[in-house]
Amino acid sequence: MAEVPGAQRPVLAGGPEPRDPLDCWACAVLVTAQNLLVAVFNLLLLALVLGTILLPAVIMLGFGFLCHSQFLRSQAPLCTSHLRDPGFTALLVTGFLLLVPLLVLALATYRRLCLRLRLADCLVPYSRALYRRRRIPQPKQIPVSPGSRSVPTPGKVWV
């Protein structure tokens, strides 16, 4: 039998309540958009951290490859006035040696930023798009009068 767009689906006892098809589609689009925004922000943050921390090694490797006679043979005044081939070889070696420790430092910094910003908590599971959240009824709180003493809970000791 065909489903009517406004009709409610039957609810299983104790389970989550399914959404209407149109509501489910709209929520799925919104969940996808939010997850894509979080992913883009993660990539931008990763690019910023990697670009900042790896910049010294990238500059050394760039000048080493740009100015060494075995690679590009550039005759730019910046290359010929300061160093010769042994100096550019030293730049290449130092750049490659610095690359791995700086990469580890950059990834540790990115992880710490992700944990501090709680970016993993911003990702929404798709089950939220398919099912409505049920409200769990809260137990009623009995107001305590100012003159009465509160009874300590078992297992906790106040010193």
UniProtKB/Swiss-Prot annotation:
Keyword Transmembrane among record annotations: yes
GO CC annotation terms, alphabetical: cytosol; plasma membrane
Keyword terms of this UniProt record: Cell membrane, Developmental protein, Membrane, Transmembrane, Transmembrane helix, Wnt signaling pathway
Location within or outside the cell: Cell membrane
Similarity annotation: Belongs to the TMEM88 family.
PANTHER family in UniProt: TRANSMEMBRANE PROTEIN 88, TRANSMEMBRANE PROTEIN 88-RELATED
Function: Inhibits the Wnt/beta-catenin signaling pathway. Crucial for heart development and acts downstream of GATA factors in the pre-cardiac mesoderm to specify lineage commitment of cardiomyocyte development.
This protein's name: Transmembrane protein 88
Species for this entry: Mus musculus
